[in-house]
A protein has these predicted regions:
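Helix-to-loop junctions at the C-terminal end of transmembrane segments
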Residues: 41-54, 138
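Structural signature of the two symmetry-related core transmembrane helices
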Residues: 56-71
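Intracellular juxtamembrane helix-capping segments at the cytosolic ends
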Residues: 94-108
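A membrane-interface helix-boundary motif in multi-pass transporters
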Residues: 136-160
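A late C-terminal transmembrane helix in Major Facilitator Superfamily
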Residues: 111-142
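Helix-loop junctions at membrane interfaces in 12-TM secondary transporters
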Residues: 73-84
Length: 177
């Protein structure tokens, strides 16, 4: 879910930044900050998972993704774009690395290759759908870049709730002995 939500928002970001009155250089700077925020945490995400547990890191990622949406919905100033996209990158990192860790730990070694392939099909199918949906939401949601940007960010909410619910279920279900 974190990968698809990141793609949903990131795809529309340059259009939204320029549509809200900033130049292409500003859009490039926002996306650059976002990409750095996606990958720099990788130096310590594994250590955080080892220390706090994978479920807590995934939950933190979901909360950070929700925070990204909240910041984006709070205004269309350049600072909002920067903060929202930096949070989006960090949330993606925690969610994606955490979920990948969960997947690896949920299967026997002989099952992992097949499960990774199925997971990649689902993940990148979701990313494709999110990317296509992003343009539709951005351009068909009221006629203004501000309305489109709001629609893109509001679209994250149901998926964050579903992912959060699934994570709660995984955390509370009885563990195999």
């Amino acid at each position: 879910v974190s990968y698809a939500l990141m793609k949903l928002v990131m795809t529309s970001t340059p259009l939204a930044v320029v549509g809200c009155g900033f130049d292409a250089g500003n859009a490039a700077d926002v996306v650059t900050a976002h990409v750095l925020a996606m990958y720099i945490p990788s130096f310590f995400t594994g250590h955080l998972i080892a220390r706090f547990g994978v479920e807590k890191i995934v939950a933190t990622g979901l909360v950070i993704l929700a925070g990204a949406g909240a910041v984006a919905l709070n205004g269309v100033h350049l600072e909002n774009f920067f903060v929202a996209l930096i949070l989006l990158g960090i949330g993606w990192n925690f969610g994606f690395i955490g979920a990948t860790t969960m997947l690896a730990g949920a299967h026997a070694p002989h099952e992992r290759g097949r499960m990774q392939g199925l997971n990649d099909l689902i993940v990148f199918g979701g990313v494709t759908f999110a990317s296509l949906s992003s343009g539709g939401l951005m351009n068909c949601s009221g006629g203004t870049p501000q309305a489109g940007w709001a629609s893109v960010n509001l679209a994250m909410a149901p998926f964050l709730m579903l992912a959060g619910g699934a994570l709660i279920w995984l955390t509370l279900r009885p563990k195999d002995a």
